[in-house]
Swiss-Prot record:
<comment type="function">
    <text>One of the primary rRNA binding proteins, it binds directly to 16S rRNA where it nucleates assembly of the body of the 30S subunit.</text>
</comment>
<protein>
    <recommendedName>
        <fullName>Small ribosomal subunit protein uS4</fullName>
    </recommendedName>
</protein>
<dbReference type="InterPro" id="IPR036986">
    <property type="entry name" value="S4_RNA-bd_sf"/>
</dbReference>
<dbReference type="InterPro" id="IPR005709">
    <property type="entry name" value="Ribosomal_uS4_bac-type"/>
</dbReference>
<keyword id="KW-0694">RNA-binding</keyword>
<dbReference type="Pfam" id="PF01479">
    <property type="entry name" value="S4"/>
</dbReference>
<dbReference type="InterPro" id="IPR002942">
    <property type="entry name" value="S4_RNA-bd"/>
</dbReference>
<feature type="domain" description="S4 RNA-binding">
    <location>
        <begin position="98"/>
        <end position="160"/>
    </location>
</feature>
<dbReference type="Pfam" id="PF00163">
    <property type="entry name" value="Ribosomal_S4"/>
</dbReference>
<dbReference type="GO" id="GO:0003735">
    <property type="term" value="F:structural constituent of ribosome"/>
</dbReference>
<comment type="subunit">
    <text>Part of the 30S ribosomal subunit. Contacts protein S5. The interaction surface between S4 and S5 is involved in control of translational fidelity.</text>
</comment>
<keyword id="KW-0689">Ribosomal protein</keyword>
<comment type="function">
    <text>With S5 and S12 plays an important role in translational accuracy.</text>
</comment>
<comment type="similarity">
    <text>Belongs to the universal ribosomal protein uS4 family.</text>
</comment>
<dbReference type="GO" id="GO:0015935">
    <property type="term" value="C:small ribosomal subunit"/>
</dbReference>
<keyword id="KW-0699">rRNA-binding</keyword>
<dbReference type="GO" id="GO:0019843">
    <property type="term" value="F:rRNA binding"/>
</dbReference>
Length: 208
């Protein structure tokens, strides 16, 4: 399966903000964007005025990178959001937030979304008591996620939990760090999600 192999720190610099792709490093002063907050490359510091299309495209790329989706995957999520009732852009973000890999990350079971995807594929996560190994699986209110018994001693998961304790857990989730399990209480409201994302630009881009 195709995947984005570009260095994660370069991806953050390309978007001009932290996308939190590298776990603990993103919360330290070792994060390159703290020292070089401009696009990578020979002409990275040169300021250019972007067209409306370029602004829309950059926003789409930023969201894709945050959630770790390829173009076809992202477009399929958008199509699903567009078919739902309500505001398409908000539907899009709620679907992305409801992916199993994203929820596992937000609960602290992975230091990054990429790591959460990996532990899911390695059968380290249970959904409602049953093995779940599809990172893109959508979950809903009342669903319970927990670390499988055999994986609770893994150093990477223990490290992820310690990192999660230093950052806030989203209000729509409930986490029991002692037993490594969590509850998806309800779907998030738009006000609960990142204010640095402008999903309306993605809607404008795909509406052309």
């Amino acid at each position: 399966m195709a995947r984005n192999i570009n260095p994660k720190c370069r991806q953050c610099r390309r978007e001009g903000e932290k996308l939190f792709l590298k776990g603990d490093k993103c919360f330290s002063d070792k994060c390159p964007i703290e020292r070089r907050n401009y696009p990578p490359g020979q002409h990275g510091q040169r300021k250019t005025r972007l067209s409306d299309y370029a602004v829309q495209l950059r926003e789409k790329q930023k969201i894709r990178r945050i959630y770790g989706l390829l173009e076809n995957q992202f477009r399929n999520v958008y199509k699903r959001a567009d078919r739902q009732k309500g505001i398409t852009g908000e539907n899009l973000l709620k679907l992305l937030e409801s992916r199993l890999d994203n929820v596992a990350y937000n609960m602290g079971f992975g230091a990054s979304r990429a790591e959460a995807r990996q532990i899911i594929r390695h059968d380290c996560i249970l959904l409602n008591g049953k093995k779940a190994n599809i990172p893109s699986q959508l979950i809903g209110p009342g669903d319970q996620i927990e670390v499988a018994e055999h994986a609770k001693s893994y150093l990477r998961i223990k490290s992820s939990i310690e990192l999660a304790k230093r950052r806030s857990i989203p209000s729509w989730l409930e986490v029991d760090f002692d037993n490594l399990k969590g509850l998806y209480k309800n779907k998030p409201d738009r006000s609960d999600l990142s204010s640095t994302i402008n999903e309306s630009l993605v809607v404008e881009l795909y509406s052309k």
